[in-house]
Each structure stands twice: as structure tokens, then as C-alpha cells.
From Swiss-Prot:
GO molecular function, one term: structural constituent of ribosome
Keywords assigned by UniProt, alphabetized: Ribonucleoprotein, Ribosomal protein
Cysteine pairs bridged by disulfides in the record: none
Entry keyword annotation includes ATP-binding: no
Family of this protein: Belongs to the bacterial ribosomal protein bL32 family.
HAMAP family with a match to the protein in the record: Ribosomal_bL32
InterPro entries: Ribosomal_bL32 (IPR002677), Ribosomal_bL32_bact (IPR044957), Ribosomal_zn-bd (IPR011332)
GO cellular component: large ribosomal subunit
GO biological process, one term: translation
Protein name as it appears in the record: Large ribosomal subunit protein bL32
Matches recorded under NCBIfam families: rpmF_bact
Transmembrane segment boundaries: none
Keyword Glycoprotein: no
Amino acid sequence: MAHPKRKTSKTRRDKRRTHYKATVAQIATCPITGEAHLYHRAYWHEGKMYYRGQVVIDKSEAVA
């Protein structure tokens, strides 16, 4: 197996890690509810779950 001949310095290690960074999440605003949410994710608003502008689950109604 390969192993390093020399210890990697803190500077070299940190320079390499500058490219490892988190991206900023894109946030959408629903045209129906006006709620801010992540793209491609369902979200709750006033007891209803919305996805792509449509109600998917409605918890406000009683299930008989």
C-alpha cells in the first residue's frame, strides 16, 4: 500500500481543503402560499403539505 514519505504540512493540507465547501441551498417561494421552501421538497403550511403548488396531505380535515 502507498504511504507518504513526508508529513503533509498544515498549510498544504489547508490549501487542498479550500475547495471542500458547502453550497448555499436554493430557496423557492411558493406562488400559492407565499411560503419559502427548498426546491424539490414538500413543505407544511397551515396543516397542509404542499409539493409543486398542490396539496399532497391535508391534516386539517378530520379522517372518518
